[in-house]
Structures are given as C-alpha cells and as structure tokens.
C-alpha cells in the first residue's frame, strides 16, 4: 500500500474502534496509539521522505484532515462517555425528596458590632453624625493636632506602631476631631459627631489589654457648649447602656487635648455601689475619659476659642461589652471561638 492508502486504512480502523469505546481511559489510549508521538500515523508519515515534492503536500493535507476529523469525533465521544457516567450515577443514587433538608445555622453579628450599633443608635437619636477615619494616620493628626507636639512628654503615655517617621497606626480615634472640624462648615451650625473604629497600641496582649481594640470618639463643638452639656450627654448615654438607676462620678484627670479633663466612673451595676469583685469593692467602675476641647485644638482648626467651645469623650467598645456581659478576658473577642461568640446570638 502507498502512503495515501495506509492513511485511509488507519482512518477507517480508528473511527471504527472509536465507535466501540465505552470509557475515558480506553478513549485516551486509542488517541495515543493512533496519533501519539510513537503512534501509527507518525510511523506512516516517516515515509514522506521518499515522496516527490508534488506528493508531499497531498499526503500532508490528508494526514491533517484525518487529525481534524478524529479530534472532533474524539471530543464528541468524550462528552458522550461523561454524560453516560453521570446518568449511571444518577440512576444508582436514590434521592427521597420528601425527607427534611439539613437545617442551616444562621450567623449573627459579632458582640462588638452589636455594642457599636447600639451606641450609634443612641447618638443618632441625639442628632449626631457618624464619621469614619483612617487607621493609618499621620503623626500630625494623631499627635500634633491633638495638642501633642513632638517634644510633648505625654506622648510617652501611648506606645505607638510607627510605619515611617511621619506615618503610624492611630493610637486613638481622636484624629477625627481635627479632620472633621477642618471639613465642617461652622457657618451652617455646630458639629456633633462620633467616630467609631479600630486603634492600635504597643501593648502586650493579656486578659485586659490588646494591641488592637475599638474606640468611639465623640465630639461636640458649637457656641456656648459647657461642661453641663457633657455631663448631661454622658449621663443619658450611660443610663441607656447600663440602666436608669446608674449614677456617674466625675474625677479630675489629664488629657492633652481637653481642659479640664475628667475620668467618668459608673456606679457598679452588680452590687449597686456596696462593693464587690467587679468594682474592686469601691462601688464604682471606671468607664471613660472626657473633657472640654482644649482651646489649642480649636485654634488649630481655625476656630476662635473665645467664640466656640466643645466637649469630647472616648468610649472603649470592648470595655463596655465586658462590663455589660461579664466577660473577663478581652482576648475572647478576637479568637473566633464559636463557643464564646454564640452566647451573644
């Protein structure tokens, strides 16, 4: 037989064998035997070296046509086998559609998210706006605009994660005070805002400390804002969070960005002020820091501190959640232990 006859014979045998193939392994073996590098077609085409220049294109075109035809029929056969395998599996696997399905367990919001949303709802009801800020902050806004110049000794109060000399992970949400005052148009009225978010300190993680935690900054700036406004606001918020019978105690303190500054304690909700292990037998629990916005902070935002005044405060979400729900280890918020989290579904 000449090469043309050999290719035609190979074509007929290959297509005939293809019809009887019943599984994918046999199908792949057939392709290898007939068209592989060491297959029959390759052996036949080795004889092209003995052909004339006129005969070679004819044989080459015939071989290519055979490859194309086999390729199309190969893919069709492969699809047929896959469909047959699927049909057989469906027939062998019985499914009783009347059986009840598997119940899907609903997820829930994280306890810190629940706490934040509850606090936000209180302040929204009081006419506050909620603003978001940068977790990667500049030294200028994190410290200098908060009345903490580079040589200020109070910078030692906060161990900071620096990214560069001028860029850091914010140590508090207070930078949003300056950023919001810069953007606010005071000719249209005063400013009332809260800024929730993550903050970072170089603390060693233990039961009461974390290198990352959540803080809600509050700020009110307008004409004729007084300490009485601050006291009334926090009294309302704390009673909504911890119960109407709670009382607040105000202690002098120091924060560079407020003057005067105060620490606010809440009467113990477990013992009613009699003294217990929760309040360390004092009857009071430290809950937040606050104060009147320092005149320097106002002036750096372009406000006349003789005309405008304001108050600011900082709430720790983890601390509030721990006190409300009797949680004694802050690490539980971040470890993703379902046994802990599902208590607050």
From Swiss-Prot:
EC number: 6.1.1.20
Keyword flag Transcription regulation: no
Reactions catalysed: tRNA(Phe) + L-phenylalanine + ATP = L-phenylalanyl-tRNA(Phe) + AMP + diphosphate + H(+)
Binding residue positions for Mg(2+): 259
UniProt entry keywords in alphabetical sequence: Aminoacyl-tRNA synthetase, ATP-binding, Cytoplasm, Ligase, Magnesium, Metal-binding, Nucleotide-binding, Protein biosynthesis
One Gene Ontology cellular component annotation held by this UniProt entry: cytoplasm
A single GO molecular function term of this UniProt record: magnesium ion binding
Cofactors that this protein relies on: Mg(2+)
Chief location: cytoplasm
The UniProt record lists the keyword ATP-binding: yes
Compartments in which it is found: Cytoplasm
Gene Ontology BP term (one): phenylalanyl-tRNA aminoacylation
Enzyme class name: ligase
InterPro entries assigned: aa-tRNA-synth_II, aa-tRNA-synth_II/BPL/LPL, Phe-tRNA-synth_IIc_asu, Phe-tRNA_ligase_II_N, Phe_tRNA_ligase_alpha1_bac, Phenylalanyl-tRNA_Synthase, tRNA-bd_arm
Cofactor binding description: Binds 2 magnesium ions per tetramer.
Pfam families given in the database record: Phe_tRNA-synt_N (PF02912), tRNA-synt_2d (PF01409)
Matching SUPFAM superfamilies: Class II aaRS and biotin synthetases, tRNA-binding arm
Family that this chain belongs to: Belongs to the class-II aminoacyl-tRNA synthetase family. Phe-tRNA synthetase alpha subunit type 1 subfamily.
NCBIfam families in UniProt: pheS
Quaternary structure and partners: Tetramer of two alpha and two beta subunits.
Name of the protein described by the UniProt record: Phenylalanine--tRNA ligase alpha subunit
């Amino acid at each position: 037989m000449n090469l043309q006859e050999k290719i035609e014979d190979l074509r007929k045998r290959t297509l005939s064998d293809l019809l009887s193939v019943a599984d994918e392994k046999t199908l792949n073996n057939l392709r290898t035997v007939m068209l592989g590098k060491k297959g029959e077609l390759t052996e036949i085409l080795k004889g092209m070296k003995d052909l004339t220049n006129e005969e070679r294109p004819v044989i080459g075109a015939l071989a290519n046509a055979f490859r194309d035809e086999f390729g199309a029929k190969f893919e069709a056969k492969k699809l047929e086998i896959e469909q047959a395998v699927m049909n057989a599996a469906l027939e062998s696997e019985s499914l009783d559609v009347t059986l009840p399905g598997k119940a899907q367990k609903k997820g829930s919001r994280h306890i810190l998210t629940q706490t934040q949303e509850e606090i936000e709802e209180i302040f929204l009801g009081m006419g506050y706006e909620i603003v978001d800020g940068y977790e990667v902050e500049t030294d200028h806004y994190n410290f200098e605009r908060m009345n903490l110049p580079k040589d200020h000794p109070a910078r030692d109060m906060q161990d900071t994660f620096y990214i560069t000399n001028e860029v850091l992970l914010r140590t508090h949400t207070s930078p949003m005070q300056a950023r919001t005052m810069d953007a606010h148009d005071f000719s249209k009225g005063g400013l009332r805002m809260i800024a929730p978010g993550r903050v970072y300190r170089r603390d060693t993680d233990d039961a009461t400390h974390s290198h990352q935690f959540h803080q809600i900054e509050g700020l009110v700036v307008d004409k004729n804002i007084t300490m009485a406004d601050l006291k009334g606001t926090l009294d309302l918020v704390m009673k909504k969070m911890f119960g109407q019978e709670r009382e607040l105690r105000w202690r002098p303190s120091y924060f560079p960005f407020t003057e005067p500054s105060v620490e606010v304690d809440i009467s113990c909700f477990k013992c009613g002020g009699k003294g217990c292990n929760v309040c360390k037998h004092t009857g009071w629990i430290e809950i937040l820091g606050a104060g009147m916005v320092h005149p320097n902070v106002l002036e750096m935002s372009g406000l006349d501190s003789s005309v405008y005044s304001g108050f600011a405060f900082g709430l720790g979400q983890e601390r509030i959640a721990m006190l409300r729900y009797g949680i004694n280890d802050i690490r539980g918020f971040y470890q993703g232990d379902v046994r802990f989290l599902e208590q607050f579904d």
